[in-house]
């Protein structure tokens, strides 16, 4: 079996979250989706599971973090060029995302949050 990673995120608006990830270039896998969770595919081995709070709570043993006041995690996506990074971030901003800090250039990589 191929190694895969499933990043599970608790979301308050499932459709809006799905639309956001679609704008970033993810696709939906309906086989692993229902009205309480959507499987969004980044690559053959990387998936983001968007789960309602109710469904997420079935898997979690602690309360769901309030991400308006706390950071629940940091996840990075590697792209081939700065232009691809800028395009993805701009698509995310158009889809309702926010960019709390400016791009940082480390020479060997760029970071946009």
What function would you assign to each model-found segment?
Residues 2, 43-45, 68-72:
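Short connector loops at helix/strand junctions that flank enzyme active sites
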Residues 35-37, 72, 110-112:
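Short hydrophobic/aromatic beta-strand or adjacent loop that forms the aromatic wall/cage
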Residues 86-113:
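Vicinal oxygen chelate
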Residues 59-65:
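Short beta-strand/turn micro-motifs at beta-sheet edges
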Residues 8-57:
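Core segments of cupin and vicinal oxygen chelate
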Residues 16, 82-87:
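Short, conserved charged micro-motifs
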Residues 1-18, 72-77:
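N-terminal beta-strand motif that seeds the catalytic metal site of vicinal oxygen chelate
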């Amino acid at each position: 079996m191929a190694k895969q990673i499933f990043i599970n995120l608790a979301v308050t608006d499932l459709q809006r979250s799905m639309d956001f990830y679609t704008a970033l270039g993810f696709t939906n896998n309906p086989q692993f989706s229902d009205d309480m969770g959507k499987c969004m595919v980044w690559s053959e081995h990387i998936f983001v599971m968007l789960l309602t709070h109710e469904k997420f709570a079935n898997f979690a043993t602690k309360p769901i973090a309030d991400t308006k006041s706390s950071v629940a995690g940091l996840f990075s996506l590697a792209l081939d060029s700065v232009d691809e990074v800028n395009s993805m971030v701009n698509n995310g901003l158009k889809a309702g995302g926010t960019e709390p800090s400016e791009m940082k250039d480390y020479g060997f990589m760029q970071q946009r949050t």
